[in-house]
Amino acid sequence: MISKPDKNKTRQRRHARVRGKISGTAERPRLNVYRSNKNIYAQVIDDVEGVTLASASTLDSEVKGNNKTEKAASVGEVVAKRAAEKKIVDVVFDRGGYLYHGRVQALAEAARENGLKF
């Protein structure tokens, strides 16, 4: 019997491979993205201390948009502004094993436009 590969399991393996190579520090924290079917979440993480420095998601009241891609761009804007308040400019982008396309790309480009460098 032919079995279909589990996309989320494949994504998790891809993310684990990438996480072995990248890590966030206090000077250059990691911008992590998690995408569910309904929402998208972004965190700026210092992996050395194990602390989240800034975060945003589509569940926040500041996030506006008519569709999921617009909301993802709004999340990128909000997380970039919250990081800027804590004087964070340089980050390492961790796409979480997702393809750089659609909502993940919209979030990343909005974060770049609002001052984050990666």
Curated annotation (Swiss-Prot):
Keyword Ribosomal protein belongs to the record: yes
- On the tree of life, the source organism's domain of life is Bacteria
Q: Does the keyword Chaperone apply?
A: no
Composition-biased stretches, type Basic residues, lie in 10-20
Keyword annotations from UniProtKB, A to Z: Ribonucleoprotein, Ribosomal protein, RNA-binding, rRNA-binding
Q: Which GO terms describe its biological process?
A: translation
**Organism, as annotated:** Lactiplantibacillus plantarum (strain ATCC BAA-793 / NCIMB 8826 / WCFS1) (Lactobacillus plantarum)
Where in this protein does the record put region Disordered? Answer: 1-24
Cellular component GO terms held in the UniProt record: cytosolic large ribosomal subunit
Per UniProt, what is one GO molecular function of this protein?
structural constituent of ribosome
Q: Which InterPro entries match?
A: Ribosomal_uL18_bac-type, Ribosomal_uL18_bac/euk
Q: What is known about what this protein does?
A: This is one of the proteins that bind and probably mediate the attachment of the 5S RNA into the large ribosomal subunit, where it forms part of the central protuberance.
Q: Which family does it belong to?
A: Belongs to the universal ribosomal protein uL18 family.
Query: What protein name is recorded for this chain?
Result: Large ribosomal subunit protein uL18
Q: Which Gene3D superfamilies match?
A: 3.30.420.100
Question: What quaternary structure, including any partners, is listed in this protein's UniProt entry?
Answer: Part of the 50S ribosomal subunit; part of the 5S rRNA/L5/L18/L25 subcomplex. Contacts the 5S and 23S rRNAs.
